[in-house]
């Protein structure tokens, strides 16, 4: 089934955050402004597959996909072949958006796994901390849990992957197809259900030999698709193709 922050298959999500977002955006000034900007602009850049899937059908001629820009970190590129005796899981918690983003489900699954395998799993949690502190707490982790209802990793998981931290979250086939990636599969994809997250975590705990390869692929994936210099050049190229760009244009 297709899923998002708002639905799972044909069923609309009824949690408070999803209801608030629908009320905020459907049939409102926000929706009208969004549509007006989309119709008036020369180009639409989407950074997640979900964004592309929303805009491309209505604006096929001016919608493009460009991955989010991420700094690369050479100091993290030397991944050891050593298999960790204890897997360090990391999860960031924003109380106001926990249910909306699926963090509540991911946390329960991670806690259950940590309880079942106390000698093999360490669970780290960052709750309501500034981003710099969040990154400091995240560093040294083996895997991050984030974005249960997404097809693609967003900024925090991408930052983690640049540091050789495995993303457990959105890694659907569409994510790889849109960037034409046929080889690398660094993301441990999960469906938006407790059982899926639990099974994925347990599989990783029981097969820690997978970790070095996934870490290396995570770094390679970011370098190949998200390096901020490469992304900036793609933005420039797209801008130059837009009808209003250039010295004689109005942009």
PLM regions with names:
Residues 166-175:
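Short hydrophobic beta-strand element within catalytic cores of glycosyltransferases
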Residues 66, 70-101, 107:
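Conserved donor-binding/catalytic core segment of Leloir-type glycosyltransferases
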Residues 135, 157-162, 176-177, 181:
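Short alpha-helical segment that forms part of, or immediately flanks, the ligand-binding pocket
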Residues 11-44:
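Membrane-proximal helix-turn-helix segments that form the acceptor-binding/catalytic region
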Residues 139-152, 165:
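Acidic donor-binding loop of glycosyltransferase active sites
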Residues 35-46, 50-70:
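Helix-loop-beta element that forms the nucleotide-linked donor phosphate-binding surface
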Residues 209-240:
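A charged, aromatic-enriched C-terminal amphipathic alpha-helix characteristic of glycosyltransferases
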């Amino acid at each position: 089934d297709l899923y998002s922050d708002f639905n799972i298959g044909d069923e609309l999500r009824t949690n408070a955050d999803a209801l608030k977002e629908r009320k905020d955006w459907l049939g409102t000034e926000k929706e009208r402004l969004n549509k007006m900007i989309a119709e008036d602009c020369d180009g639409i850049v989407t950074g997640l597959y979900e964004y592309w899937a929303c805009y491309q059908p209505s604006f096929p001629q001016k919608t493009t996909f460009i991955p989010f820009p991420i700094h690369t970190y050479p100091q993290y590129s030397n991944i050891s072949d050593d298999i960790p005796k204890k897997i360090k899981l990391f999860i960031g918690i924003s109380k106001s958006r926990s249910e909306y983003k699926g963090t509540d489900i991911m946390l329960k699954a991670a806690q259950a796994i940590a309880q079942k395998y106390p000698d093999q799993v360490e669970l780290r949690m960052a709750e309501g901390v500034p981003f710099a502190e969040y990154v400091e707490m995240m560093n040294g982790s083996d895997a991050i849990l984030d974005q249960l209802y997404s097809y693609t990793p967003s900024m925090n998981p991408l930052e983690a992957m640049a540091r050789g931290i495995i993303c457990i979250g959105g890694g659907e086939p569409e994510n790889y197809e849109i960037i034409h990636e046929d080889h690398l599969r660094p993301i441990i994809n999960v469906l938006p259900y407790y059982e899926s997250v639990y099974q994925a975590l347990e599989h990783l705990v029981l097969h820690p030999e997978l970790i070095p390869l996934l870490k290396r692929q995570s770094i390679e994936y970011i370098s190949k698709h998200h390096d901020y210099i490469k992304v900036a050049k793609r933005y420039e190229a797209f801008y130059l193709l837009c009808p209003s760009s250039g010295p004689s244009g109005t942009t």
